[in-house]
C-alpha cells in the first residue's frame, strides 16, 4: 500500500435509494433502506478510499462491521455515507462511519478492512475450493 492513507482521511459517497436497496418483506408501504444494503454501501465506500492508496495487485476485504441502523430512509431519498480513517495498522485499516439522509442520521459505527495481495488471496480461495471439493467428493 502506498503511503498517505492516514487517520483523518475521508470519503463521502451519495446514493439514491431504489427498490434494490430496500426491504420488501413488510410490503410496499414499508419499503425502506435495508440494513444489509447500508452495510454493503459502507463497505464499498471504505474500499474506494483504500483503493486510492493501493498498489497494483492489491485490494481489501472486510474484517469487522459494527453499525447501528438508527432511522428509516425511504426509496427516492439520498443517503450520504461519510467514512473517516481512525487507524492504519500495517494492512489493517479502521474507519468511523456515518450515514445520513435528507432528514436524519440513519447509521453510525465502525468498519475494519484488511489490504490483501489479490494473487495470494486467489490462491487461498482455490486451495479452499479444492479442499471442499475433496470433502464433498
Predicted feature descriptions by range:
Residues 1-34:
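Catalytic strand-loop segment that frames the active site of acyl-thioester-processing enzymes
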Residues 29, 33-37, 94, 116:
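Residues at secondary-structure transition points
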Residues 47-80:
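Hydrophobic beta-strand-centered segment that forms part of the acyl-chain substrate-binding groove
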Residues 67-102:
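Hydrophobic beta-sheet segments that form the core/acyl-binding groove
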